Amino acid sequence: MDNEKLKAIDAAMSQIEKQFGKGAIMKLGEQDILNIDAISTGCLSLDIALGIGGVPRGRVVEIYGPESSGKTTVALHILAEAQKKGGAAAFIDAEHALDPQYARALGVDIDNLVVSQPDTGEQALEIAEALVRSGAIDVIVVDSVAALVPKAEIEGEMGDSHVGLQARLMSQALRKLTGSINKSKCIAIFINQLREKVGIMFGNPETTPGGRALKFYASVRMDIRKIDTIKQGEEMIGNRVRVKVVKNKVAPPFKQAEFDIMYNEGISREGNIVDVGVKENIIQKSGAWFSYGDIRLGQGRENAKLFFKENIDIRSEVENKIREKYDLPIQKVKNEKPKIEKGTENNTK
């Protein structure tokens, strides 16, 4: 490109920046755009599947799946990781179902978590917009899109038809929110449920409520499913879960991650490190025995998990070796998250 054209472009860009502010226009190769900052999900295999070490800042993320598959659990882990980095987090509880005890057990600082339980879908999305525009929130979770009921539906009679109201509401909200989310580097996580299309004979009958807008605006979409129940003798102690990254605008999509969600504990970090460590040949498995170099971790996966729980330094060493292999940020040794108080109901959200 000749110098005259370059000068004209620079002059135009300078004029646009004066009129609309710094960051209104830029060249794509500028360094601060190329590096996409991410917040960890608290699950090593999911961070690897997402390709950038977590969920991207300044983007919309959708987590959807059947009931009790672990959607809220994954979202709460992301909130906890954001708070550990010194960030502020907000939770729009449209379902009115947030369990503070469970959130605390997952590592969420509930004393500093901003929570809203809105009456209508419009109110929920206006609160979300105000929080995003403040520029102070790092992660905001909306739980769930299906529970964002338009005001007209709440004030109307039971049985009244309100076709397309929720879809229009979501479309309008996302048009307004996307720019603010990007500028403030906030992560907006929308949790969504599943519905079935009526009369579908071929293809996948499953769909998510709230219209198509969220599918378009989301940079990352995660489909989370329970694939097995974890038992200790006859007692059920958790779920084995598979997450498929069905859309990813910041890394290659369609990668999968499997991990354990233990009741009252959340994602099993130790179990995840054992699984990924064996896959990457950092942990050796011989018969039922697991070992790391000359260190015997235990006989059976549960004993290996127990060893890592009791030896945090070795667990962190193994985790960081895996992270180095995938060019993910190195984790510092942290204290264990608090245990949930006795008497709290067993539940995987």
From Swiss-Prot:
SUPFAM superfamilies: P-loop containing nucleoside triphosphate hydrolases, RecA protein, C-terminal domain. InterPro entries: AAA+_ATPase, DNA_recomb/repair_RecA, DNA_recomb/repair_RecA_CS, P-loop_NTPase, RecA-like_C, RecA-like_N, RecA_ATP-bd, RecA_C_sf. Keywords: ATP-binding, Cytoplasm, DNA damage, DNA recombination, DNA repair, DNA-binding, Nucleotide-binding, SOS response. It comes from the Bacteria. GO terms for biological process: DNA recombination; DNA repair; SOS response. PANTHER family: MITOCHONDRIAL DNA REPAIR PROTEIN RECA HOMOLOG-RELATED, RECA. NCBIfam families: tigrfam_recA. Belongs to the RecA family. This is Protein RecA. It comes from Clostridium acetobutylicum (strain ATCC 824 / DSM 792 / JCM 1419 / IAM 19013 / LMG 5710 / NBRC 13948 / NRRL B-527 / VKM B-1787 / 2291 / W).
